[in-house]
Design a protein with these regions (language model features):
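The feature captures the beta-strand-to-loop junction immediately N-terminal to the Walker
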Residues: 33-35
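Helix-to-loop junction immediately C-terminal to a conserved catalytic motif
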Residues: 48
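Conserved ABC transporter NBD signature motif
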Residues: 56-66
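ABC ATPase NBD coupling module
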Residues: 65-82, 106
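Conserved ABC ATPase signature
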Residues: 131-135, 139
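A short, proline-enriched helix->beta-strand linker immediately N-terminal to the Walker B motif
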Residues: 150-154
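Catalytic Walker B motif of ABC-type/P-loop ATPase nucleotide-binding domains
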Residues: 156-159
Length: 160
């Protein structure tokens, strides 16, 4: 379960997130739909500690993390979350397989097996030796999803 409490974030005078509260139960799939510029990306970035809000807490796995401060607990929280960005940030000079292996923190031999399994899971196993420039946008997105899944996150955040 993930619970966000009183999350607020401003950019200069513009308050983008104003005391956001939400609760997501294990197994839930939640979509956030709103017009451009209303804070969806900022919300995800704050949850994953890529942006630091003025205030707010996250409760996940029984642990409370003050999102407004960078500290050891927030780094631990990031280790159990995976995020796929709107722009996939694939390494252009690495194959699909190498891109998935990049984020794994296990021995090389094991990382290849895990990466292949996740590429297969997203329907990209036959493209393992292709570079991002030879993949469509949708295929690149599937490689990015495989990379996030390979880390076995407890929480997966998908941006568009």
């Amino acid at each position: 379960m993930l619970e966000i409490k009183n999350l607020s974030k401003s950019f200069h005078e513009n308050k983008v997130l104003d005391h956001i509260n939400l609760k997501i139960e294990k197994g839930d799939v939640v979509g956030i739909i709103s017009p451009s510029g209303t804070g969806k990306s900022t919300l995800l970035r704050c949850i994953n500690q890529l942006e630091i809000p003025e205030e707010g807490e996250a409760v996940f796995g029984g642990k409370t993390v003050d999102l407004s401060k960078k500290h050891k607990d927030s780094l631990e929280f990031r280790k159990i979350t995976g995020m796929v960005f709107q722009r996939f940030y694939l390494f252009e000079k690495k194959t699909a397989l190498e891109n998935v292996r990049e984020g794994l923190m296990v021995v090389q031999k094991k990382s290849k097996a895990i990466a292949l399994k996740e590429l297969e899971r997203v329907g990209m196993a036959s493209w393992e030796n292709h570079y991002p420039k030879h993949l469509s946008g949708g295929q690149q997105q599937r490689v990015a999803i495989a990379r996030a899944l390979a880390l076995k996150p407890e929480l997966l955040l998908l941006h568009e």
